[in-house]
């Protein structure tokens, strides 16, 4: 019927628009129009399930994920993904946290090493001074 064809055409149009939204990075988009054709209904359901899986395994906003990855590539680990729910989002935040911890540990270790090195240098200077004093005393006798 004409009404069924119009309903199907509307669903196809919305499906194409939804794919465009997903291509722009938004994985929360879903097809809501209801076609009449059973094959189009199945296609709509399959596409929506695919989007559900992508959102669960990756996250909601591909652009935000890409931005964080670019920051990480530039060795900037200060930012996190807000409202991380997808596996990639959660893992990205966890990796960022672990890298920050490792960098802090390395910094603490380097500071401790610098402090101990200063103490050692001072001890060597004292030992050298004492050795020179003893050598001078021995020369006097």
Q: What does each model-found stretch correspond to?
A:
Residues 1-141:
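HAMP domain helices
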């Amino acid at each position: 019927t004409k009404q069924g064809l119009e309903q199907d055409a509307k669903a196809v149009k919305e499906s194409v628009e939804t794919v465009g939204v997903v291509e722009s990075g938004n994985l929360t988009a879903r097809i809501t129009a209801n076609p009449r054709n059973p094959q189009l209904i199945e296609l709509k359901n399959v596409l929506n399930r695919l989007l559900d899986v992508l959102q669960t395994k990756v996250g909601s906003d591909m652009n935000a994920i890409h931005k964080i990855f670019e920051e990480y590539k530039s060795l900037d680990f200060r930012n996190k993904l807000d409202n991380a729910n997808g596996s990639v989002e959660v893992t990205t935040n966890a990796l960022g946290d672990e890298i920050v911890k490792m960098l802090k540990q390395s910094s603490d270790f380097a500071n401790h090493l610098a402090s101990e090195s200063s103490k050692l240098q001072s001890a060597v200077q004292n030992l050298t001074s004492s050795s020179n004093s003893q050598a001078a005393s021995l020369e006097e006798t």
